[in-house]
């Protein structure tokens, strides 16, 4: 574009605005919500004082946020509330086009649905156009009018959603559609299909009893404490895959860190193979525990060091635990990489993280966790940052490892549909406590608690159609 900076500033927000993926990074942490909205209004509308304040209140009302939040700072808001604030700022000058770049990726499924419902309601009310960018095809099939499928930097298919739902014309489109998990209907067949009957040893490999974790609230003089995990108890058996499901702030990732002993609990006990590890009393974690329980983190780029090769990442734990000598190291690492689908392994061993896709990086993270031949892997949201086809590939790796190695997996996710396809049993968490626990299919088909019912509904196709006439799609298009 041959435009001056002044022209671009005039164009930005007035003609087109954007809602970024990470609301936390999009908002200035040292400015209040009101100050950030006022900045846009002052620059583009010349509004100051009471005029700006009144307009800011109107914008908060549009996204269902109380006016007193104008004095709040980003760190005082939930993820869903921060994203609503970013949407309010994008609407400040009422541009005809709003670009939404992965606006719900970091949000749990219930908050995601609330945000999308509000966006569609505002579109109907205010008449703006949305360019919605996401890797979540299932989400777009619910509310988009038209859909452009991209692969390797090119659009491979562009059509109305109602036509794509009947079957795409491009093989890649059909691959994406076939990879979409659902929390409703009959469970799809495939590698992830679990046996009709699974038998596990009588004694659990992992048992958590009355686990509790409290965090000190930030601030030098703030003596308040946040109860993240409240008397949680559950058992996991050898060869079992257990899904730990809940919204943001439910305590599931805190439990992952407690089980892997990355943090110490405030109270409670963890038993491994029937042995009480007395985690509340010991600060030092035995090497044997680290070898037995490994973790796969949510962000495959953040969990890998950008300056080291894949070989270094897998070799380091082997050196630390003295499991392989120098001559055994490289062949073993190649074997691990090929075990998780990275072939040829000798080629991937020499790569750096930035030379791989998100799915490949997550496979490396899984291979690293497998390097010590652990009995338990704690997978903390391992697929939340991956697109739907890669997500299913990663789930298949865990299913394959369980089948071949009798590996035990504690699978932590906010995606109930993914948990259904992988886990034998699902534990639902809310506000640090267990709400419901049952075999996966029983919990999906017949949830007992209201919160579980909300999760199932939010993860099922057709959730948007139940919200009323405000959310109807357009039936006709004008190509002009």
Q: What kind of feature is each model-predicted range?
A:
Residues 51-68, 328-347:
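Conserved ABC ATPase "signature" region
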Residues 85, 90-91, 364, 370:
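ABC ATPase C-loop
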Residues 92-96, 371-375:
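A short, proline-enriched helix->beta-strand linker immediately N-terminal to the Walker B motif
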Residues 140-142, 419-421:
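A short, surface-exposed alpha-helical micro-motif characterized by mixed small hydrophobic
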Residues 155-159, 167, 437-438:
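ABC ATPase "signature
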Residues 245-247:
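The feature captures the beta-strand-to-loop junction immediately N-terminal to the Walker
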Residues 260:
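Helix-to-loop junction immediately C-terminal to a conserved catalytic motif
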């Amino acid at each position: 574009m041959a435009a001056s900076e002044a022209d671009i500033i005039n164009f930005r927000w007035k003609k087109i605005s954007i809602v970024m993926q990470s609301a936390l990074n999009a908002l200035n942490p040292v400015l209040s919500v009101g100050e950030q909205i006022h900045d846009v209004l002052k620059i583009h509308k010349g509004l100051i004082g009471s005029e700006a304040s009144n307009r800011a209140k109107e914008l908060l009302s549009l996204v269902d946020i109380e006016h007193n939040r104008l004095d709040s700072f980003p760190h005082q808001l939930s993820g869903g509330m921060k994203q609503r604030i970013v949407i309010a700022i994008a609407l400040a000058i009422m541009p005809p086009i709003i670009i939404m770049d992965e606006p719900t990726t970091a949000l749990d499924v219930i908050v995601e649905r609330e945000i999308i419902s509000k966006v569609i309601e505002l579109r109907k009310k205010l008449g703006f156009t949305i360019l919605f960018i996401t890797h979540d095809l299932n989400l777009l099939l619910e509310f988009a009018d038209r859909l452009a499928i991209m692969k390797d930097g090119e659009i491979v298919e562009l059509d109305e959603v109602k036509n794509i739902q009947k079957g795409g014309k491009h093989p890649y489109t059909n691959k994406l559609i076939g990879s979409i998990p659902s929390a409703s209907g009959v469970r799809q067949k495939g590698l992830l299909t679990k046996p009709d009957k699974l038998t596990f040893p009588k004694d659990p490999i992992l048992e958590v009893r009355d686990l509790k974790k409290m965090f000190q609230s930030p601030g030098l003089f703030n003596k308040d404490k946040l109860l993240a995990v409240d008397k949680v108890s559950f058992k996991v058996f050898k060869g079992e895959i257990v899904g730990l499901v809940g919204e943001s702030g439910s305590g599931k990732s805190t439990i992952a860190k407690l089980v892997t002993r990355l943090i110490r609990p405030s109270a409670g006990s963890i038993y491994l193979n029937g042995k009480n590890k007395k985690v509340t009393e010991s600060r030092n974690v035995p090497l044997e525990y680290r070898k037995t329980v490994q973790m796969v983190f949510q962000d495959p780029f953040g969990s890998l060091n950008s300056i080291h090769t894949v070989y270094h990442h897998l070799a380091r734990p082997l050196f630390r635990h003295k499991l392989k000598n120098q001559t055994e190291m490289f062949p073993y690492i190649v074997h691990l990489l090929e075990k998780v689908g990275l072939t040829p392994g000798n080629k991937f061993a020499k790569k750096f993280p930035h030379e791989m896709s998100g799915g490949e990086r997550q496979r490396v993270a899984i291979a690293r966790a497998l390097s010590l031949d652990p009995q338990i892997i704690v997978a903390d949201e391992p697929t939340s940052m991956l697109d739907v086809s890669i997500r299913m590939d990663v789930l298949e790796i865990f299913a394959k490892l369980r089948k071949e190695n009798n590996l035990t997996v504690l699978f932590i996710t906010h995606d109930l549909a993914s948990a259904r396809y992988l886990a034998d049993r699902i534990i639902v968490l809310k506000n640090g406590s267990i709400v419901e626990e049952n075999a996966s299919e029983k919990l999906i088909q017949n949830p007992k608690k209201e919160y579980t019912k909300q999760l199932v509904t939010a993860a099922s196709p057709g959730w948007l159609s139940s919200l009323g006439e405000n959310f109807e799609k357009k039936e006709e298009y004008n190509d002009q």
